[in-house]
Amino acid sequence: MSDTFWAFVGLVLFLALLVYFQIPQKIIHHLDARAKRIKDELDEALRLREEAQEILAEYQRKHAEAEKDAQEIIAAAKHEVESVIAEARTKAEEYVKNRNKLAEQKIAQAEADAIRMVSSSAIDLAISTARVLIAKELDSNRADELVKEALSKESLSKMKTHLN
């Protein structure tokens, strides 16, 4: 009996002991459990991946909505600014028109005042000149009568209408 024979017998006995103690079934059971655990982990990873993709899609949709809302807000703000500018421009033009109208009224009033002053001065000068001429040419009684007549309201209103 050779060494090879005894090595073969030892191998057969070892394998028989393994079968007797059900080691191959235990190894198979352990490998099956590990394969099941790995399969469960892969299923969980796929489920988590799908959930992550759903969340990503939802956030991308929300981001797109937020962009759209931001663009709408910007457009509304631009429209509001344009409205405010147009209103301010209209008010400024109206203010300038009112100021010009007021200035024209003040100028017209100043012209009227100047005309009245010149008319009044001209009347006073005419009266003074008439008084001096009358005093030289007429006696004092007749001069006073003519001055009183000239200063009457009727004659003053006639003079004003002629001067205007």
Swiss-Prot record:
It holds the Pfam family ATP-synt_B. It comes from the Bacteria. It is a single-pass membrane protein. The chain crosses the membrane at residues 4-24. It is found in: Cell inner membrane. One of its GO terms (cellular component) is proton-transporting ATP synthase complex. Keywords: ATP synthesis, Cell inner membrane, Cell membrane, CF(0), Hydrogen ion transport, Ion transport, Membrane, Transmembrane, Transmembrane helix, Transport. GO terms for molecular function: proton-transporting ATP synthase activity, rotational mechanism; proton-transporting ATPase activity, rotational mechanism. InterPro entries: ATP_synth_b/b'su_bac/chlpt (IPR002146), ATP_synthase_B_chain (IPR050059). F-type ATPases have 2 components, F(1) - the catalytic core - and F(0) - the membrane proton channel. F(1) has five subunits: alpha(3), beta(3), gamma(1), delta(1), epsilon(1). F(0) has three main subunits: a(1), b(2) and c(10-14). The alpha and beta chains form an alternating ring which encloses part of the gamma chain. F(1) is attached to F(0) by a central stalk formed by the gamma and epsilon chains, while a peripheral stalk is formed by the delta and b chains. Belongs to the ATPase B chain family. F(1)F(0) ATP synthase produces ATP from ADP in the presence of a proton or sodium gradient. F-type ATPases consist of two structural domains, F(1) containing the extramembraneous catalytic core and F(0) containing the membrane proton channel, linked together by a central stalk and a peripheral stalk. During catalysis, ATP synthesis in the catalytic domain of F(1) is coupled via a rotary mechanism of the central stalk subunits to proton translocation. This is ATP synthase subunit b 2. It comes from Bartonella tribocorum (strain CIP 105476 / IBS 506).
